[in-house]
Amino acid sequence: VNYEKIKISSKEKKIKIDSEQEIITGSFIKSFGADVVKKYLSSSRINDALINISSSTITGLNKRKKFWKVIIEDPDDETKDLFLLKLSNKSISVSGNNNSFISINGENYGHIISPKTGFPGKNKLLAVISSSAFKSDVFSTGLYNFSGCDFIQKINSIDDLEGVLINEKREIFYSENFKDFILENYTK
């Protein structure tokens, strides 16, 4: 987890890492692919589409010229919903440790690692909305380990991002305009 051992050379277009490290691109390649598919469909004059690739979803207008409805599930109980969102020409990416973890001696260890501790992050869920699947995916992982207050400050400072963070105490933190996407809020 020592990012300081990663050397990036823009001039040489190379990345060097320590022999004990690896960079796994699967975390963002799917969202990059979703943006490529969206661009292809758009160039083919297909604007009525919903593209779902794992935890990244891109929406266009549906055939009734209405927004798409997207559900964010409760990270502790997937039979319950937290939000019903309305999205049009946007992407949403949801990150969390609820579905991707390993259990050791009764303790669940998630796949999103805190760069500060080297251990799995404790937040329950983070969802990010953007016009780009790649951007929403990268930020939903990148902001995952932030505290609620730091999350709000950071996400509100970046153009074309809205989101919601649910911490380990199940406290909910919204970006400034996230509420504009909410059709139903089941957390009340």
PLM regions and their residue ranges:
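Mature catalytic core of soluble alpha/beta enzymes
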Residues: 1-188
